[in-house]
Amino acid sequence: MNVVIWLAVLFSTFIGYIQAEKTELTYRIISPVENQVIQRDSANKAWVEINISTSLQVSKSGSLEYRLDKNRSWEKANGEWKDERFFARLRVRAGGWHTIEVRDSRTPDHRSQVVQFGVGEVFVVAGQSNSGNYGEIKQSTQTGLVSAFDFENNKWQ
């Protein structure tokens, strides 16, 4: 019976060690946020402010990479660390949704979540009954390329 208990403790410790190894380094993209739209400029591009956080001590020796859109290659992230936050700016073309993901080049399994954001036109609509879907017919996007900011809940949707 003591052997069974000892094996159970050993197995639990081993599983805990494996889980700790898998989550040793994690990143979270603070900005851009999901479904955010950034105004394009006259060159049909925008500077996108990237803000990444980590709760763990990380090497700040240039091992952070990003991938803009799934079918593109990973690139070195050039930016600045301040405490546990990384700040960078990327030049992104307008036209549709983009995704961004971050990882540690030394341990590629340690990644951030994938965030979808857009670069294009930002319009402020106020005072129109249909702008808040209060008209006779609720409005909906036909293309999926429309996002709205909910001021009450402070989020893009």
Residue ranges and their predicted role:
Residues M1-V9:
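Sec-dependent signal peptide recognition
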Residues V9-I18:
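Hydrophobic h-region of N-terminal signal peptides that target proteins for export
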Residues E21-Q157:
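Cell-envelope and extracellular/periplasmic
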